[in-house]
Each structure stands twice: as structure tokens, then as C-alpha cells.
Design a protein with these regions (language model features):
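ATP-dependent adenylation/pyrophosphate-handling site
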Residues: 1-15
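Residue-level marker of intrinsically disordered, low-complexity segments enriched
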Residues: 3, 25-28
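A structural preference for short, hydrophobic beta-strand core positions in alpha/beta folds
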Residues: 3, 34-37, 108
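A short, flexible beta-alpha/helix-coil linker loop
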Residues: 8-9, 39-41
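Metal-dependent de-N-acetylase/amidase catalytic core
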Residues: 11, 15-16, 26, 45-184
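Alpha-helical scaffolding within the catalytic cores
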Residues: 18-22
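A conserved beta-strand->alpha-helix junction
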Residues: 27-40
Length: 184
């Protein structure tokens, strides 16, 4: 697993995000992280092509077969722009003569209390059509990885509580014919 973070700071956070990223990635077994310096709270003002080029550089380096990004209709502006830029960067093998093979799958992920908060339109809804079976251990690792970030995990009924995250995995699993699953 490789992770490309376009922004690693936010003026609204007071925790040590770099430590959280390192701890979270260690829990998940991330091989390499690509960390950009684009401003989280001013993403719409960033150079769009610079963001695409940063993602393309990560694609050239790790050569993924699967790219997972935010859903385009995510309520957070930076998540929507990230999704758009990832789609553009994924076309790299078609635009340039390079040694990068095609990306076989692009999956939009579900982010609790983010993907589901946007206006409900026929175009903007998260409607999963791909599921990845996960284990109870995977769910525990996900929860542990998220827990290293201050104020991300909340008490139920918040969408990012351990109870709700587990319930979502059970619900998505039932849709996929498995005990637990993640939806894309």
C-alpha cells in the first residue's frame, strides 16, 4: 500500500499531524508515503496542474494497479479537488510515453461524516458498486489508525465512532455477501 497525501497540515488542527500520519501508516503497513505541501484550507486556490503533476510523480514511482481516492461529491472542497486531480493523473499512461502501466481500477472511497454530508442529487450521491471484503482485524487496524489523530474518533452516534464504523463494515458486508466489507 502506498499513500499520497496532498496536504499535511491544517490551521484548524492543534495536534501533531506528522506523528499521526507516521503512526497510522505504521499500523496499516504503508510501504511509502508521498506528502505534498498544498494548503488544505485553500485547495481551490492551489495550482491545479501542480497537484496533478504531484500525483503523477507518485504514480510513476509506485506504479499502482488500483487507485483509491475521495468520492467527487464529497462535501469537503479539498476532497472533491483531490478526486478530480486523481482522475486526471490516472490518464498519465495515455498522455505520455512512459514506463507506467495502466491503472486497472479507480475506486472512490466512502469517508464517514464527509461523503454522506453533501447535497443529495442523482449525480452527487455515493453509490457503491465495488466492495472489498475485510476482516475484523482489518476493522481494528482501521480504527487504530484513525485513533492516532486527535478528535477524529468520536462517541456514538457520530459517524466516526467505533460502533458506527463497525456497523458500516457489517452493512457493506451484507451488501457484498461477506461478514465485513469496505465500499467503493
Amino acid at each position: 500500500v502506498y499513500v499520497c497525501l496532498l496536504s499535511h497540515w491544517s490551521p484548524t488542527r492543534d495536534d501533531n499531524l506528522e506523528e499521526g500520519i507516521a503512526s497510522s501508516h505504521a499500523i496499516l503497513g504503508v510501504k511509502k508515503s508521498y506528502v505534498g505541501d498544498f494548503g488544505c484550507m485553500r485547495f481551490k486556490d492551489e495550482d491545479h496542474h501542480a497537484i496533478v503533476r504531484f500525483i503523477e510523480a507518485a504514480i510513476k514511482d509506485c506504479q499502482p494497479e488500483v487507485l483509491i481516492t475521495h468520492h467527487p461529491a464529497d462535501v469537503h472542497v479539498d476532497h472533491g479537488i483531490t478526486s478530480e486531480c486523481c482522475l486526471e493523473a490516472a490518464k498519465l499512461p495515455m498522455r505520455q510515453i512512459c514506463s507506467v502501466g495502466p491503472i486497472k481500477s479507480i475506486l472512490f472511497m466512502e469517508v464517514p461524516s464527509s461523503t454522506d454530508w453533501n447535497i443529495n442529487t442523482s449525480v452527487g450521491c455515493f453509490r457503491p458498486n465495488a466492495f472489498m471484503e475485510v476482516s475484523q482485524e482489518d476493522i481494528r487496524k482501521k480504527f487504530d489508525a484513525i485513533s492516532v489523530y486527535k478528535d477524529v474518533i468520536r462517541n456514538a452516534p457520530h459517524p466516526r465512532s467505533s460502533n458506527v464504523l463497525t456497523s458500516m463494515a457489517i452493512c457493506r458486508g451484507s451488501q457484498a455477501g461477506a461478514e465485513y466489507a469496505e465500499a467503493f
